[in-house]
Amino acid sequence: MNQLEKEILVFKTDLETPERLDAIKPFLDQHPGIIKWNVDNHDIDNVLRIESRNMAPADIIELAKDAGISCEELPD
């Protein structure tokens, strides 16, 4: 991947409540590889979308795990 190339990573999560969202927010906000992120709580899968540079899905899954959040990559 080109150093300047952005990638969108998409995950199914259990970010159903504001409290769960607050648990992961510091991890995502402070990570240098994450450009921006959002959660679609209107989707049944509480989809987490991350715009990143040089991050693998496993990196995000590990961040979520560290925050106590369930997270799995959604296929394209």
Please state what every model-predicted region is:
Residues 2-15:
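Short glycine-/aliphatic-rich beta-strand segments at the starts of folded cytosolic domains
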Residues 44-46, 51, 59:
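Short, charge-rich amphipathic interface segments used for partner binding and complex assembly
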Residues 12-15, 49-54:
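Short beta-strand-to-loop capping motifs
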Residues 5, 19, 38:
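Solvent-exposed, flexible loop/coil residues
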Residues 38-44:
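RNA-recognition motif
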Residues 14-32:
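Short amphipathic alpha-helix segments
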Residues 53-76:
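C-terminal structural segments of small proteins and small subunits
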